[in-house]
């Protein structure tokens, strides 16, 4: 928790410094909302040795930002990714499960607070093209079901505080006075969940520790305030 508060405070300080610099310029605050579709990277369940695939998830972000210059802006966003799972059925290869057909799923619960910066690369009459990056704290945990959940069939890991990273490429167009719509691709690394040991057939077996990285396509709105 101390790590989470420290990173959050640092993020807020950086954003505040950027805003203080921008106050001498004739720029504006904005609110933003984003939603879309995400797919997690394939990952291996180390407990049973099965490689998992992602179904579709929904990333959602809310934020507040400031136009620092004509082609530069920064914002602070609170986001999550909901509804997605890493899952797979197949033959286990690790000890304790070798040769067993299993069905396993990992459902993450992610909450992230990111400070993001963006630069417009080109500005056309109808739209802009921009790149950006973000960093900040993320709380990550997961619900594991199936063979990897072992004796209870289902197990939950505790929240782990990670540093989340985000890379962004997108385009934006003004649709009304003070309102812009965005279409963007982003890659997010939220880090690994906690691992834990559970007892299976008299032996201590490690589960959890899944890494969550995602590819995201989102549509967003920026409202000047």
Swiss-Prot record:
Pfam families: OmpA_membrane (PF01389). The keyword Disulfide bond does not apply. This is Putative adhesin RT0816. GO terms for cellular component: cell outer membrane. InterPro entries: OMP/PagP_b-brl (IPR011250), OmpA-like_TM_dom (IPR000498). Disulfide bonds: none annotated. Residues 1-22 form the signal peptide.
